[in-house]
């Protein structure tokens, strides 16, 4: 009798437990369906910390925030010649599983590391400057630097005359985009090229401090120089410092730059810089990362995207800030 009293309650408990399990399964919230595709991880690498590349980054960050299907990892080198820094960033991003890298290459030296990334299925979009000899990139999103240089040269041809002296502050010799800015400028001079004298050509690594020292050497050796062309924006700021130190007045030396950075535009307004070729870094950044994303998603993208140039002078400087 006592045995039956024990068994009945146990059977009842087991029965209730079974009902509870079934009921909880029926009332439980259905599992959310899995996303058909995971978020695409992309890398975005820029050369070094100056306004131009910060603008590229900020544009890519805005795109990233507005694109839920993507996650962008950012890295930046220390200088215009920091090949090692970019190579390390490429390696790090590949290790973190990016499916694509958008990069402003410091030089052709980084292409070997990009080849390794491509072998692992990573797409590569070059921004700001091309590596013409390297054919494995998916796309190039950049200023046409040769055309920009021609624009500068044509402008200089309206300011110079036969017999005038021209100095050139190069960027990083051997970097195709920067060389194109110089070659384009010389081409843009047209027939005047053979009538003027290029008295000095010095490299600056696109750095303000190196631009300052190069400008000191150039102006000391050529005190009667008529014009100076700079293939990058930061060296112009160093040049302006030298002009002021040497007691020059705005306009004494024709100064034409490339980049039209905010600080350059301020010098254009003040009369120290005569003109600069403007790029559109925000456009490069946003189109660069968007083009990369489309290619990773299997969409067809153009091999080249020209983001345009414009000549900035005192007449239109207000349109470019500074």
Located regions from the model:
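N-terminal signal peptide c-region/cleavage motif recognized by signal peptidases
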Residues: 23-25
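A residue-level marker of the well-folded mature domains of exported/periplasmic proteins
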Residues: 3-9, 27-322
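Bacterial N-terminal signal peptides
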Residues: 11-21
């Amino acid at each position: 009798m006592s045995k039956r009293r024990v068994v009945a309650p146990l059977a009842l408990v087991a029965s209730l437990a079974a009902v509870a399990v079934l009921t909880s399964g029926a009332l439980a919230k259905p599992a959310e369906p899995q996303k058909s595709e995971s978020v695409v991880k992309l890398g975005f690498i820029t050369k070094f910390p100056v306004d131009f590349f910060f603008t590229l980054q900020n544009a890519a960050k805005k795109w990233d925030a507005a694109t839920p299907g993507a996650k962008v990892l950012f890295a930046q080198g220390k200088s215009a010649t920091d090949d090692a820094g970019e190579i390390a960033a490429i390696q790090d991003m590949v290790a973190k599983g990016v499916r694509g890298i958008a990069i402003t290459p410091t030089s052709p030296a980084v292409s070997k590391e990009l080849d390794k990334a491509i072998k692992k299925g990573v797409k590569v979009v070059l921004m700001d400057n091309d590596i013409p000899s390297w054919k494995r990139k998916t796309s190039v999103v950049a200023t046409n630097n040769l055309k920009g240089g021609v624009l500068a040269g044509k402008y200089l041809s309206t300011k110079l005359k036969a017999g005038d002296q021209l100095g050139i502050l190069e960027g990083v010799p051997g970097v195709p985009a920067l060389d194109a800015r110089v070659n384009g400028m010389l081409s843009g001079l047209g027939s005047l090229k053979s009538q003027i004298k290029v008295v000095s050509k010095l490299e600056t690594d696109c750095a303000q401090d190196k631009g300052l020292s190069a400008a000191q050497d150039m102006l000391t050796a050529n005190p009667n120089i008529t014009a100076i062309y700079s293939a990058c924006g930061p060296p112009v700021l160093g040049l302006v410092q030298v002009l002021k130190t040497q007691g020059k007045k705005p306009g004494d030396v024709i100064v034409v730059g490339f980049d039209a950075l905010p600080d350059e535009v301020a010098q254009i307004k003040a009369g120290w810089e005569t003109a600069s070729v403007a790029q559109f870094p925000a456009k490069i950044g946003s189109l660069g990362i968007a083009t990369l994303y489309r290619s990773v998603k299997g969409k067809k993208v153009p091999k080249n995207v020209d983001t345009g140039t414009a000549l900035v002078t005192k007449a239109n400087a207000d349109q470019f800030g500074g």
